[in-house]
């Protein structure tokens, strides 16, 4: 138990990843509590906490360093401090005063900029310039203070969607704007998403295709007849925890493809610009996936070579519960790195944007483009 651990001469607590950040903050900085046994390590005189930056991101010294030490101020840190001060005081940026800065550990900014007014104006303008109605850049307009450049126009765009719904869930409005503003938009669905489909959906679609075979082909298609019987029997005998057969996983993947095509059609994206990559790491039939491999990276790389995009959108909500978003984004970055090593010319005119949606939102201070 806890008392045995506390009796050790030295204790190490290890953690990594964004999903541990909130708990680490409670363990290290929160009150000692029975509900968080690791918080008792605060009483140990030789306890060490080893973290990566993602797990440490909520600690005061990382998130709000101005409260514990002098800072080397840069634009990002100043923006973080002002957003925090607004939330703390309940005031909008332009109403912050010298007193607010002095009473909350931000007097260094007054010394740096001369007054609260000067800091307020700077950060207000910085945040205002992230807001745009032109995610692909506004053609024939001054782009000095816009988040995306005006040229080239139109742009070739790839939106990488880890599952066949993340594109519309997380950046559906942005996707629609890009299409409406005449950019060449491609959507790359990185995984099949098959394990998210329920067995009842498979039964429904099998009833449909069997009925189609009966009505239009007098039930003469033996492949459909055999698969219909085989899959119905399999699902009838299937127990909780049993893995799906490869055929059922394929059908579930087809169902997700149909949903994705419908979404693209609704947003006026030609079906030839819908790319189903079916990255191999995902195809285990289980929640636990395989590690990313060279085969995964090569599939992504081939698409990049084909399209030569000016904009790439990848999932930035890396704390999704299954870890698929992080692996998919890593595959894109690995492919880009390989292209960079080979001196790919298209990369010189390409920008990568990370979107968030279903599992996490960007903090105000970290937003670079809000559409």
Task: For the regions a language model picked out, list residue spans one by one.
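Di-metal (Zn2+ and/or Mg2+/Mn2+) metal-binding site signature of metallo-dependent hydrolases
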Residues: 162-180
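Conserved strand-to-helix beginnings and helix N-cap segments that scaffold or border functional pockets
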Residues: 25, 168-172, 322-329
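Hydrophobic anchor at the start of a short beta-strand
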Residues: 11, 47, 185, 271-272, ...
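Charged, composition-biased interaction segments
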Residues: 36-37, 225-247
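Metal-dependent de-N-acetylase/amidase catalytic core
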Residues: 1, 89-158, 177-180, 190, ...
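Conserved phosphate- and dinucleotide-binding cores of soluble alpha/beta proteins
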Residues: 1-82
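Cofactor-binding loop segments of dinucleotide-utilizing enzymes, especially the Rossmann-like FAD-
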Residues: 16, 52-54, 162, 190-192, ...
